[in-house]
Amino acid sequence: MTGFDPKVFVQSLTGAPGVYRMLSAVGEVLYVGKARNLRKRVGSYFARGAHSGKTHAMLQRVAGIEVTVTHTENEALLLEDNLVKSLKPRYNILLRDDKSY
């Protein structure tokens, strides 16, 4: 995964709901998130502004992003939950404890 340009990538995204996976240079899934609007949510990571230390550290390692478009927000929520539980991404601390929604 070389030459990842987040601005170009964000422009190519849809405004539909879905799930995104942030990947390292070796393909490790760093973070899984859901969005009502993929373009706005993923774009928010790369907009100017203050990020928490955890988010800043993660963004330094992002070399690519994969997305799955869903039909509904509920479908995105379920998919995100399943992916976090199965992939156990390093930066998904909040969803790791198997809490039910």
Question: Residue ranges of each PLM-predicted region?
Answer:
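Acidic, glycine-enriched active-site microenvironments
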Residues: M1-Y101
